[in-house]
Structures are given as structure tokens and as C-alpha cells.
UniProtKB/Swiss-Prot annotation:
Function: Protease inhibitor that may play a role in the regulation of protease activities during hematopoiesis and apoptosis induced by TNF. May regulate protease activities in the cytoplasm and in the nucleus.
Keywords in alphabetical order: Cytoplasm, Nucleus, Protease inhibitor, Serine protease inhibitor
Residues marked Reactive bond (site): 362-363
Listed name of the protein: Serpin B10
Family, as annotated: Belongs to the serpin family. Ov-serpin subfamily.
Entry annotated with the keyword tRNA processing: no
UniProt feature coiled coil, ranges: none
PROSITE patterns attached to this UniProt entry: SERPIN (PS00284)
GO terms for cellular component: cytoplasm; extracellular space; nucleus
Length: 397
């Protein structure tokens, strides 16, 4: 499971860099865990070069030394044997079970779906394996004759799976009579902070978009003993904010320079992120924290981004090899749709009962101020598995 978490986290960074190329100056929010899980469901039915490309993009090659070398990255070809592929899917099975454990103190609603044109029927074994490893069921639908109704049905299902928070995932032109197969992945998250902000301390403050312009935000404030890490190059400060029971943590990285986010995003690597956010790098401070309230709800049509990362054959009718899921030739992936929703506020989401008092050992710690009044990146991490569930960039209220 550790190597799978490494793969997901590496994918998070590579994917975020691709999004940053086209979404300059825009907010970003996606779930690398959600996207990886959905694509792994398709990977289960791929063979040949299609499988090789998907494994490479999803970082299923677990050799971290190879990953860390820019020279080797271009040359890397991932051909995994059946035992390795089996380990990957068994890893997802365990990871899904851990992250969706009913005893967790957070809510994570996920909609993962594979919809294939019914004239390309799925193998029974593929259907059984998807249910075993991912708890999902591929759907055979009639895109040829009823594509718009299928789109509406998919949207209704996603909306119900996410407690109404994610309606209309597929836009009007998302599918048509020529659609062969689409993937959908939508996630809604809510959690309570370990230390909640006081609503009375929230005030309107300027959020500096760059050195010359700003927008008003509702800025939350608290003074608490929190774990902090410092980054020397590029200069930035990181902070760990735990959710209830420390099942999850929000890791925020704030560049020192108002316009330093672009440099940080380009420079950050998997190894650096692992080092920065390790327990060894964390120091306890009394932190005067100022963090904007915000809600992020981002939708992505992933076809272009994934193809540009090297996963092109899956979307090409003449090259795609999905013979592991269907006997019919010319089956290919028409598109992948992803949407995530998160709200950051004083409570995390809803106020918790009986949280009025806090007992702590009175140890004098150095005091620092962290004022997130300019663009920053953040991660929501599942601590037990060290998996990045969500990646976000907040740069425009």
C-alpha cells in the first residue's frame, strides 16, 4: 500500500504541473486519489502499449530512484508482470477500504463510474474483478440511440452519490451517439477541524492576488500550537492543520513572495514534498494563523491533459487495446470527467458538540504569524496511508 500511495502522490504533482500550464492564475482543486482509482479501473482491462502508457502516467512503476531522475523519466517504460499488476489492484482494494472506513470521522462521498456502449459488452471476469477490487460495476448503456438521456442519468447518479453537492457533472455536449466509453469520478468531502476557528474572529480582509491587485475575503483567525515546516528554496512556510482524530490533515504551503507560487509549483518534486511534510521536518510553534474561508468546486475534462502526459493510445480508436475488458475491437476511451468539491470554513463543516474546552500542557513555544493572504497550495492527506486525497491551489477568491 505504501508504494501505491507513493504512486498516487507522484501523480498528484505531475498532474498539477500539467494543469498549471493551462490554468495560470486560476484556482485548482482535484483528487489524485479519485482520478487514480477511476483510471485504475480501466487499467484493469488494458493490454499492450495502452497498459504501458497508463502505468507510466499513473506512476505504477514503484522504483523511486527512477522517478527522481529527470533523465530517466523520459526514457522510462513501464512493463509490469501479472503479479505486479495484481498487487496494484489489491493495493487499491485495501486503500479504498481504509479511506472509506465507516469509523472515520470525516465524510467522503465518491462516485466512480465506467459507462460503455452496450454493443461493446464487458467480459464477465472484468465485471467481477472491478466489483472485487473497486466495489464498482461497469455499466453497459445505449449511447447510440439515447446519449442525452444517458448523460442525464449519469448526472443524477453522481448527484445522489455526493449528497447533492455535485450536480451536472457532464455538460450538454459531453457524450453523443459516437461515444464508446466514458469514465466519471466525483468527490465530495467534509471534515471537522481538530481545532476549530471562532466565527467571531472572522473578518473581511484583502487577499493579494499579486503585487498590485487584491480582492476581499472572509479571513479566519486562530492562535494555536501547530506543526510548521520551513522551505528554503524557494522560500516558503508550510503548516499542518489536522482534522478531527488526525485521520486527515490539510498541509498548506505559503510562498514568502506574493508572486512566488509559480516558482514553487515548478520547483516542487515528489522527493521534496515527502521531505518537507515528514514528521522530522515539523516543528511546533504557537501560530497566529490567518486563513481565508473558501469553497472550491472544480470540473475537469481530463482527455487532453492525460494524453499530453503520455496516455494517448487509450483515447485513440485505432490504437487502444481494451481486450482485457471486451472482445469487441475499436473500443476506446472517449473521455474522463472529474469534479471535486470542498469547503474550508471555521468548523471544517458543521459545529461539533462538546468542543468548548481544550486542555493542553503549558509549554512556552516560539510564536510566529502565518498570514495566507496571497496565493498558496494545499493538500488534504490521509495520514495512515500517507495518500494525497486532494490537491488544491487557491489564488483567486
Amino acid at each position: 500500500m505504501d508504494s501505491l500511495a507513493n504512486s498516487i502522490n507522484q501523480f498528484a504533482l505531475e498532474f498539477s504541473k500539467k494543469l498549471a500550464e493551462t490554468d495560470e492564475g486560476k484556482n485548482i482543486f482535484f483528487s489524485p486519489w479519485g482520478i487514480s482509482t477511476t483510471l485504475a479501473m480501466v487499467y484493469l482491462g488494458t493490454k499492450g502499449t495502452t497498459a504501458t502508457q497508463m502505468a507510466q502516467v499513473l506512476q505504477f512503476d514503484t522504483d523511486q530512484d527512477v522517478k527522481s531522475s529527470p533523465e530517466n523519466e523520459k526514457k522510462r517504460k513501464v512493463d509490469l508482470n501479472s503479479d505486479q499488476v495484481g498487487e496494484i489492484h489489491f493495493g487499491f482494494q485495501k486503500l479504498i477500504s481504509e479511506i472509506n472506513n465507516p469509523s472515520n470521522t470525516y465524510v467522503l462521498k465518491t462516485a466512480n463510474g465506467i459507462y460503455g456502449e452496450k454493443t461493446y459488452p464487458f467480459h464477465n471476469k472484468y465485471i467481477e474483478d472491478i466489483k472485487t477490487y473497486f466495489g464498482a460495476k461497469p455499466q453497459s448503456v445505449n449511447f447510440v440511440e439515447d446519449s442525452d438521456q444517458i448523460r442525464k442519468d449519469i448526472n443524477s447518479w453522481v448527484e445522489s452519490q455526493t449528497e447533492g453537492k455535485i450536480p451536472n457533472l457532464l455538460p450538454d455536449d459531453a457524450v453523443d451517439s459516437a461515444t464508446k466509453m466514458v469514465l466519471v469520478n466525483a468527490l465530495y468531502f467534509k471534515g471537522l477541524w481538530e481545532h476549530q476557528f471562532s466565527v467571531q474572529d472572522t473578518t473581511e480582509k484583502p487577499f493579494r492576488i499579486n503585487k498590485t491587485s487584491s480582492k476581499p475575503v472572509q479571513m479566519m483567525s486562530m492562535k494555536k500550537n501547530l506543526e510548521v515546516f520551513h522551505i528554503e528554496k524557494p522560500q516558503a512556510t508550510g503548516l499542518r492543520l489536522d482534522y478531527k482524530n488526525r485521520d486527515l490533515s490539510l498541509l498548506l504551503i505559503l510562498p514568502e513572495d506574493v508572486c512566488g507560487l509559480d516558482q514553487l509549483e515548478k520547483a516542487i518534486t515528489y522527493d521534496q514534498l515527502s521531505e518537507w511534510t515528514s514528521e522530522d521536518m515539523m516543528e511546533m510553534y504557537t501560530v497566529e494563523l490567518h486563513l481565508p474561508k473558501f469553497k472550491l468546486e472544480q470540473s475537469y475534462d481530463l482527455k487532453t491533459t492525460l494524453a499530453s502526459m503520455g496516455m494517448s493510445d487509450a483515447f485513440n480508436q485505432s490504437k487502444a487495446d481494451f481486450s482485457g475488458m471486451s472482445d469487441e475491437r475499436n473500443l476506446y476511451l472517449s473521455n474522463v470527467f472529474h469534479k471535486s468539491f470542498v469547503e474550508i470554513n471555521e468548523q471544517g463543516t458543521e459545529a461539533a458538540a462538546g468542543s468548548a474546552s481544550e486542555i493542553s500542557v503549558r509549554i512556552k513555544l516560539p510564536t510566529i504569524e502565518i498570514n495566507a493572504d496571497h496565493p498558496f497550495i494545499f493538500f488534504i492527506r490521509h495520514n495512515k496511508t500517507n495518500s494525497i486525497l486532494f490537491y488544491g491551489r487557491f489564488c483567486s477568491p
